[in-house]
Amino acid sequence: MQIDLLLQTRMSFCLVEIKRRLQIGREVMDEMREKVRRFSPPKGVSVRTALIYDGELAPSVEADGYFDAIVPARRLLGL
């Protein structure tokens, strides 16, 4: 498993998953949970999660509230 993008601030890490598929389902949350479980930040540093996606996102992914941020690639690119 690889972390697609890792952002760091003084007190937190943000693990970013980037997905480009026709259908993006709940399995994306399972994959990220495993990455977070394996990630070992220094003590006192929080871990946040984000998803950048291109495709059709299953409504349950957003409704679940697991990701701290969900960003469509089109918005990121200003399209």
Task: Label the model's feature ranges.
Residues M1-L79:
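A cross-kingdom feature that marks ATP-driven nucleic-acid transaction machinery
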